[in-house]
From Swiss-Prot:
UniProt cofactor note: Binds 1 [4Fe-4S] cluster.
Catalytic activity, as annotated: Couples ATP hydrolysis with the unwinding of duplex DNA at the replication fork by translocating in the 5'-3' direction. This creates two antiparallel DNA single strands (ssDNA). The leading ssDNA polymer is the template for DNA polymerase III holoenzyme which synthesizes a continuous strand; ATP + H2O = ADP + phosphate + H(+)
TM stretches of this protein: none
Keywords: ATP-binding, DNA-binding, Helicase, Hydrolase, Iron, Iron-sulfur, Isomerase, Metal-binding, Nucleotide-binding
GO molecular function, a single term: ATP hydrolysis activity
Top-rank lineage group of the source organism: Bacteria
Cofactor: [4Fe-4S] cluster
Biological source species: Bacillus subtilis (strain 168)
Enzyme class (EC, first level): isomerase
Lineage, broadest ranks: Bacteria, Bacillati, Bacillota, Bacilli, Bacillales
Stored InterPro entries: ATP-dep_Helicase_C (IPR006555), DinG/Rad3-like (IPR045028), Helic_SF1/SF2_ATP-bd_DinG/Rad3 (IPR014013), P-loop_NTPase (IPR027417)
UniProt: [4Fe-4S] cluster binding residues: 133, 197, 200, 206
Protein name per Swiss-Prot or TrEMBL: Probable ATP-dependent helicase YpvA
């Protein structure tokens, strides 16, 4: 216990939780209102309910409406509890954009530090893909003569290029530091799961490695994404077996911000990705050693089976509109090829045990190959048990992806069985007032819950136009959207269900000569676009991923346009969910997903008692039943257009 760092004093007559309760009351009733913050009954109610979850070390679903100030509440508890226990608390956000929202200059952590005179040790633990890969940068520089790559290389810290004594190493390579690169450009130089980091000669000068070392030493908060936290959970044991540290250090508590999105993050983290060239790389490395002829022939057979599997997979896959995932059609033929490859990989796994006793292969290299072969064999066996699967293609490279259908059992065992506080925070956690659906999907059997409404007067602050009478095409919607942008002099967030629709608007809007800059997700690092949008008021932001969490109070945002109803794509992941529905796939999968996204999208507009503006929802072409369902989740009566 590090009581000297607690933001309040402990006495002999009262325990930590009693003193914490008193301090939280002082903060919300006296200290923050004196600094200009609103006194919100909903926020105070949530705070005193949350104390029970920390005291009893339980799971809590904290459903709090927009504007409750839930982030301030869970931050105060997380910081205090981390200092009391002596281990950092984890704040897991839905994605990297929301991490940046939390730690920006005018974000909630900065507000608490300033107004409560606290020094908060906050460190970011971003997903691997958010970091530069030195090896990929070298390859990109070799095949492209664009000056931007040379400029990037020369901007790297001196210790990357030089080997000398007494050098000071520090974290670098974060995506945010290269905001000018588009998403496509970034993918050419960023980490991907097929990089062989364990044997990389630049490993100890790598920005990802140095960043990990840095955030592990946090004493208060480590902020990561849901994906990264789940990757930590699934890889913790295997990393220990390989002699590596887990991705995250031992921690005191976990807060899942936008917690309704955790199930998909868990599925994503449990996903196995198999690239055609990776097995070739590992097995051909073995062939360079002095191995038995019988083993060499087995490797050759496996390489042929690998080529055959990916050939069949490519032949039997088709593209899906609105998704980068290719659907596998003739499952039987692919499974037959997978069965043969899996059989040979199992044989290689057995042979590797024998080879390890011959000492003809470097033991570390052997363990790396063994781990990969085992993982690939498991992926193929998972596929044969009807897991969710698809194919991805980039340039000439194919990647086979396998994802489990459910994660409830493994989550219940590996995560929620631990006796620490787990807080789920979101405006949309329950269905019809019940938290059973989300609890069951995550393997949670014992939990606390609370629900508080939004403190905002939506009838006074918001108007909604629902375009449902006529089915507009993209050109008509573009013209209407441009008119609303002009009316509000920019200050508009346009939300799209997919990049295809965003790019269509991007192309059509280029013909209009608007005096207001339009920022499109994908053109730059997204948190830098959000920053520009907030600082330069007369601008427009178009996004696919900002339905949740975006917090822009004030005059920078006066208008939110929902381009079309955000139904899930018809890709393998949601097709599997539909196939698993008990009665009606549309009622159980598509409709709830769409309504949740609409509620979240609307929540971007009003972020303070002083905010006002309008929502425009394009739902033309949908039947009356769907329109009625949309109207039920709207906070005010819409104007039907």
């Amino acid at each position: 216990m590090t009581t000297s760092r607690l933001p309040f004093s402990l006495t002999k007559t009262k325990n930590f939780y009693e003193e914490l309760n008193n301090w939280i009351g002082d903060v919300f009733y006296d200290i923050l209102p004196e600094k200009g913050f609103d006194l919100r009954d909903e926020q105070v109610f949530m705070a005193f309910q949350l104390e029970r979850a920390f005291k009893e070390k339980k799971v809590m679903f904290a459903e709090a409406g927009v504007g409750t100030g839930k982030t301030l509440v869970y931050l105060l508890f997380a910081i205090s509890y981390a200092r009391y226990v002596g281990k950092p608390a984890i704040i897991a956000c839905a994605d990297e954009t929301l991490i940046e929202q939390l730690v920006k200059k005018e974000g909630d952590i900065s507000k608490l530090a300033e107004h409560l005179d606290l020094k908060i040790d906050t460190r970011l633990s971003k997903s691997h893909e958010q970091y530069l890969c030195l090896k990929k940068l070298e390859k990109t520089m070799q095949r492209s003569d664009d000056d931007k790559w040379l400029d990037l290389y020369e901007s790297l810290p001196s210790f990357v290029h030089e080997s000398q004594a007494m050098q000071r190493f520090y974290p670098y390579g974060d995506r945010k530091q290269y905001a000018n690169l588009s998403n496509e450009e970034w993918s050419d130089v960023s980490y991907d799961s097929f990089q062989d980091c364990l044997t990389c000669d630049m490993r100890h000068r790598c920005g990802l490695t140095l960043s990990r070392d840095y955030y592990r030493k946090s004493t208060d908060l480590i902020i990561c994404s849901h994906d990264f936290y789940m990757e930590h959970v699934w890889t913790e044991e295997s990393r220990k077996r390989e002699g590596q540290l887990p991705l995250l250090p031992d921690h005191s508590a976990v807060v899942f911000d936008e917690g309704h999105l955790l199930e998909f993050a868990a599925q994503k983290a449990l996903t196995y990705r198999v690239k055609q060239s990776t097995l070739e790389l590992f097995l051909e490395r073995l062939l360079q050693n002095d191995i038995r002829e019988e083993f060499a022939e087995l490797i050759e057979d496996a390489l042929l089976a690998n080529d055959e599997f990916f050939y069949v997979l490519s032949e039997e896959s088709k593209e899906v509109a609105g998704s980068h995932r290719l659907e596998i059609k003739n499952d039987h033929r692919v499974k037959k090829a997978a069965d043969e490859l899996c059989r040979l990989l199992d044989k290689i796994g057995e042979a590797l045990v024998f080879e390890s006793e011959m000492y003809t292969i470097d033991q570390y290299e052997l363990s790396v190959v063994e781990e990969y072969v085992e993982q690939m064999a498991y992926s193929l066996s998972l596929y044969q048990k009807d897991a969710i699967s698809w194919l991805e293609k980039k340039e000439a490279e194919s990647t086979f992806v396998v994802m489990p259908r459910t994660v409830a059992e493994v989550l219940g065992e590996k995560v929620f069985s631990k006796k620490i506080p787990y807080i789920f925070s979101s405006a949309t956690l329950s269905e019809g007032g019940s938290f059973d659906y989300i609890a069951d999907s995550l393997g949670i059997h014992d939990y606390l819950s609370l629900t508080v409404d939004s403190p905002y007067d939506y009838d006074e602050q918001m108007s909604i136009n629902l375009y449902a009478k006529t089915d507009m095409d993209a050109e008509q919607k573009t013209a209407e959207t441009i008119e609303t942008i002009k009316r509000y002099k920019g200050r508009t967030l346009v939300l799209f269900p997919s990049f295809e629709e965003l790019n269509e608007f991007k192309e059509l809007s280029a013909a209009w000569e608007l005096p207001y800059p339009i920022f499109f997700e994908g053109d730059e690092e997204i948190s830098s676009l959000v920053e520009k949008f907030q600082e330069e008021e007369e601008t427009v932001l178009c996004s696919v991923h900002l339905w949740e969490g975006l917090d822009i109070p004030g005059d920078a945002l006066k208008n939110v346009t929902i381009w079309s109803l955000p139904f899930p794509p018809h890709d393998p992941v949601f097709t599997a969910k539909r196939n698993g529905a008990k009665k009606d796939p549309f009622e159980e999968v598509d409709l709830p997903y769409m309504l949740l996204r609409v509620r979240q999208g609307i929540g971007r507009l009003i972020r303070s008692n002083q905010d006002s503006g309008s929502i425009h929802i394009y739902a033309g072409g949908e039947n009356e039943r769907i329109i009625d369902e949309v109207k039920k989740v709207l906070p005010v009566e819409p104007h039907m257009m």
